């Protein structure tokens, strides 16, 4: 069609059609780019080795081996992540580094977090690595506001056992986590292993939980177990001593990945 020979009204209509087509194409390309970023694994080793990480976090690395966790959980740039029981924000910041620059990490803590942990978490928010971290001070059984939806990943690291002796409705909590994830989204939970048969009974005394008991609670909410990590396993652990304060001997820890 020759735009020069159009009437003014027709030309304007044609120009509007072209503009709409270009806008659709741009949006489509952005969406493809975002999906491609989410499907591309970042260099986790380089992120862990980043020179601006604190010495305190590097000390924690010695017993946590975060590279293994990142590979297992598989956070990607652009993802929306919820870190449950974020504490001082050690794992929250690691996740934030992996989803940057366009992703976001919500760090949930209940009201009444200890002052030291609270100070460490708030300090992270002021650093370049913490610019995509959003603090959520909310109860475990209502961990996210209504507008936080379609999450790609939820992490719940070494804190689930604490909810067994706190005034927390764990069934409600797990349903909320399920609702907050997008279809296909993942929930990764790590905790200290209790003996078979101990269930949730030693959460307060030994700070442990039986993996099968935890699994049952999560699956009741609708989740499906899709992976297990053995990189923190220590079969020599007798599982009859408290991990608080941290003992000077190996502790068996399980890591489970569930999917919505």
Where do the PLM segments sit?
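A short glycine-rich, Lys/Arg-flanked "PGG" loop and its adjoining helix->strand segment in the class I
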Residues: 96, 170-183
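A short acidic, Gly/Pro-enriched loop at the edge of an enzyme's catalytic core
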Residues: 144-154
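Core SAM-dependent methyltransferase catalytic element
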Residues: 237-260
